[in-house]
């Protein structure tokens, strides 16, 4: 790490990431050159070709009427960063891509808890992607850039925050892997954290604040080849491996802030508005504790919420005159008291608000085939959380086309998550998905990607929709379970079923033998209230053998390694229980729905693709019209043929093979052909796609002379014909076959041979 003033007012700090045999990556932060009117601005570079600008600004006046912290994070992808013009109609960037939205969430999650409580000034962080090597990912660079610019803005911010992607490649955890290296990775995770002190050996003590992780789509293949499986212990090792890299990035950001003079800013000009005064909390506690403690033992969410709202109304009525004009403080103090009672009961009694023990899972239910015409459907319930999963299969050409700075250009598996307001018994806006819905859908998608069959094994585009019909804790992990069930119901040959569970953590200082010690209690299958009042939201999805996806957010300054390892082990026990319940509903792929298309794959020579398509698509369109099948051709000669019934698909395949993989007809073969052209000298009949024969006018009259071909046949007529001759140039001469001749030939083929007949008569 190094820091320098490269020119007057321009400062630069560098962190070098050493990956051993995988080489080094250099992260460089620069301030003082671009966006100087922002409160804080930083240009972050990854090696030489990746360049991001982050600017942090704050409103002059606080929004005192807000009861939340108004932080906004935006990521602006500029297509010029990759030397491209946007593909939209207006040829300029529009709404943010899914990659940009997910990066916004990655930045927001560790940054938000790093601000002081009670801040009400509007804070906006805008990260603009200026240059990007197509072999690199920008999301983790954006986390560091956003943290660095916020650190320079003089805000009441307890950063800096460092973010790193580490991937398990050839048994080593590699930081900032590129796209090419990720092709060989077993597991990949983004980890963010900050330095909170110093270890006994003098190394920085890093508190992990956020984790977003997943197994790669090649994990099963790599593990079968000898790579380590991403088990709970391996994932825990990866989290520890990320800490030195985070420390280096945080140190570089701090050095930049020190050199530029930003650390001299105290943030005193930004007032803090406590949610309530101590006097209000004391009054609320005095009148509400007993009744609220009793209400929090009610098992049902609706009944419990109704009773707590009644108590809250009683408290407001009793204290309204004493604390006139401070009703919002009374409400905030009531919430704080609720949080204290919930946490106290968990830590001291290991008992939860719905009566469960700390490792108990709510009642589970799973069933499939609920939606009649859907290709696959399932309902998964865990307590009051209810998820409907619906699967739709289609041709591979229906894969999503992606126009963003990410490495993906198409997406064959699309997972969409919907969270309507009625799922929590409320009213609200419905319509286009919000960032939270996009994030939850992406998490469920990543959990299932490692077990999906390849396009060669299952040549379909797959759309999975998760409908959150009821919510009381981790609808995203419920979506993973419902999706596994629906995919199996649709006939998708998953490599293994996947289930997910949400874990929580509550910590407090307790007196033990006259000493105060920190006690951590890990909760299995958290409720919505336990998520809101707890210290950690830890979602883990996986098969019975390994983890496929993981998401962690914590409000603590670090979680001990043994606590995290224990949470992972506890999550596995719960996952295995859920998988057993799911297996009772369905454990192998069902037969495909009669409403789903049957897709068959064939190969044609690349030089025959043009012939199959025909001029302006004439040939392929005619095959589609005649057979009713859908046809999609890839550049490598792979042809996908889809139809709702087998005969239609086979008819299309036969026609394609006749063009691209032809077998020449022989003299004596009979066909039911279509007249495609008439001339003065005869009628051309299509025998196979791309292969016609001529019935001469002299052969059309059945022994009688005719003056005009159209007097006997017209274009579109069906004729039963036989190949009479094929000349040296391949031209085919045809003769008509009478229907009775054809029937006689068929009967002769079915009758016994003469020798057999003689034997029978004797």
Swiss-Prot record:
UniProt xrefs under Pfam families: KH_1 (PF00013), PNPase (PF03726), RNase_PH (PF01138), S1 (PF00575)
Biological-process GO terms, alphabetical: mRNA catabolic process; RNA processing
GO cellular component: cytosol
Reaction catalysed by this enzyme: RNA(n+1) + phosphate = RNA(n) + a ribonucleoside 5'-diphosphate
Enzyme class: transferase
UniProtKB keywords: Cytoplasm, Magnesium, Metal-binding, Nucleotidyltransferase, RNA-binding, Transferase
Subcellular location: Cytoplasm
Domain KH: 597-656
Superkingdom field: Bacteria
Cofactor needs: Mg(2+)
Coiled-coil region: none
Residues given in the record as Mg(2+) binding sites: 531, 537
S1 motif domain segment(s): 668-737
Primary location recorded for the protein, binned into one broad class: cytoplasm
Family: Belongs to the polyribonucleotide nucleotidyltransferase family.
Function: Involved in mRNA degradation. Catalyzes the phosphorolysis of single-stranded polyribonucleotides processively in the 3'- to 5'-direction.
Protein name: Polyribonucleotide nucleotidyltransferase
Organism listed in the record: Mycobacterium marinum (strain ATCC BAA-535 / M)
């Amino acid at each position: 790490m190094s820091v320098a003033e490269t020119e007057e007012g321009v400062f630069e700090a560098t962190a070098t990431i050493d990956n051993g045999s995988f080489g080094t990556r250099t992260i460089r932060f620069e301030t003082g050159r671009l966006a100087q009117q922002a409160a804080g601005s930083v240009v972050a570079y990854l090696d030489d070709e990746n360049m991001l600008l982050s600017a942090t600004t704050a409103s002059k006046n606080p929004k005192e009427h807000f009861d939340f912290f108004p932080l906004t994070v935006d990521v602006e992808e500029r297509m010029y960063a990759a030397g491209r013009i946007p593909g939209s109609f207006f040829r300029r960037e529009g709404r943010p891509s899914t990659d940009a939205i997910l990066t916004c969430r990655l930045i927001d999650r560790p940054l938000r808890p790093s601000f002081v409580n009670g801040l009400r000034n509007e804070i906006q962080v805008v990260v603009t992607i200026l240059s990007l090597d197509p072999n690199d990912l920008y999301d983790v660079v954006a986390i560091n850039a956003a943290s660095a610019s916020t650190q320079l803005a003089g805000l009441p911010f307890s950063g800096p925050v460092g973010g790193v992607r580490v991937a398990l490649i050839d048994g080593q955890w590699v930081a900032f892997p590129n796209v090419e290296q990720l092709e060989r990775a077993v597991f990949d995770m983004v980890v963010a954290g900050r330095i909170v002190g110093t270890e006994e050996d003098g190394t920085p003590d890093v508190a992990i604040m956020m984790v977003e992780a997943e197994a790669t789509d090649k994990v099963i293949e790599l593990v079968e080849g000898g790579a380590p499986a991403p088990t709970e212990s391996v994932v825990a090792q990866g989290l520890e491996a990320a800490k030195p890299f985070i420390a280096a990035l945080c140190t570089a950001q701090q050095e930049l802030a020190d050199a530029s003079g930003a650390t001299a800013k105290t943030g005193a000009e930004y007032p803090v508005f406590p949610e309530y005064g101590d006097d209000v909390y004391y009054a609320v506690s005095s009148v509400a504790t007993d009744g609220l403690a009793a209400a929090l033992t009610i098992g049902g969410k609706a009944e419990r919420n109704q009773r707590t709202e009644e108590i809250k109304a009683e408290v407001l009525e009793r204290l309204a005159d004493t604390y006139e004009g401070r009703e919002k403080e009374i409400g905030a103090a009531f919430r704080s008291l609720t949080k204290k009672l919930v946490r106290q009961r968990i830590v001291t009694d290991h008992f939860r608000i719905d009566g469960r023990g700390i490792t108990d899972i709510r009642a589970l239910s799973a069933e499939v085939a609920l939606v009649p015409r859907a290709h696959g459907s399932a309902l998964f319930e865990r307590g009051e959380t209810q998820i409907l999963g619906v699967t739709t299969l289609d041709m591979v050409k229906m894969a999503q086309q992606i126009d963003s700075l990410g490495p993906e250009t198409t997406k064959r598996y699309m997972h969409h998550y919907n969270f309507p307001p009625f799922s929590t018994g409320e009213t609200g806006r419905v319509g286009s998905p919000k960032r939270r819905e996009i994030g939850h859908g992406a998490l469920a998608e990543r959990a299932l990607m490692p077990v999906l069959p390849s396009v060669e094994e299952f040549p379909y585009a797959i759309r999975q929709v998760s409908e959150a019909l009821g919510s009381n804790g981790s609808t995203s992990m419920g979506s993973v379970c419902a999706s596994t069930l629906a995919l199996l119901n649709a006939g998708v040959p998953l490599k293994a079923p996947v289930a997910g569970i949400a874990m929580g953590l509550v910590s407090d200082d307790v007196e033990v033998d006259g000493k105060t010690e920190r006690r951590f209690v890990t909760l299995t299958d958290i409720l919505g209230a336990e998520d809101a009042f707890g210290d950690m939201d830890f979602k883990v999805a996986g098969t019975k053998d390994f983890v496929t996806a993981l998401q962690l957010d914590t409000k603590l300054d670090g979680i001990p390694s043994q606590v995290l390892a224990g949470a992972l082990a506890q999550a596995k026990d719960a996952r295995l229980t859920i998988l057993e319940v799911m297996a009772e509903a369905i454990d192998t792929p069902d037969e495909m729905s009669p409403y789903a298309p049957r897709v068959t794959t064939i190969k044609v020579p690349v030089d025959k693709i043009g012939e199959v398509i025909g001029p302006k698509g004439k040939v392929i369109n005619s095959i589609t019209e005649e057979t009713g099948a859908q046809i999609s051709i890839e550049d490598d000669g792979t042809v996908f043929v889809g139809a709702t019934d087998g005969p239609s698909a086979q008819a299309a395949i036969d026609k394609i093979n006749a063009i691209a993989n032809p077998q020449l007809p022989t003299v004596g073969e009979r066909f039911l052909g279509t007249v495609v052209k008439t001339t003065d000298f005869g009628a051309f009949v299509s025998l196979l796609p791309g292969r016609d024969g001529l019935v001469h006018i002299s052969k059309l009259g059945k022994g009688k002379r005719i003056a005009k071909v159209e007097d006997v046949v017209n274009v579109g007529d069906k004729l039963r014909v036989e190949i009479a001759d094929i000349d040296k140039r391949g031209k085919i001469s045809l003769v008509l076959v009478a229907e009775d001749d054809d029937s006689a030939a068929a009967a002769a083929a079915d009758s016994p041979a003469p020798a057999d007949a003689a034997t029978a008569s004797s």
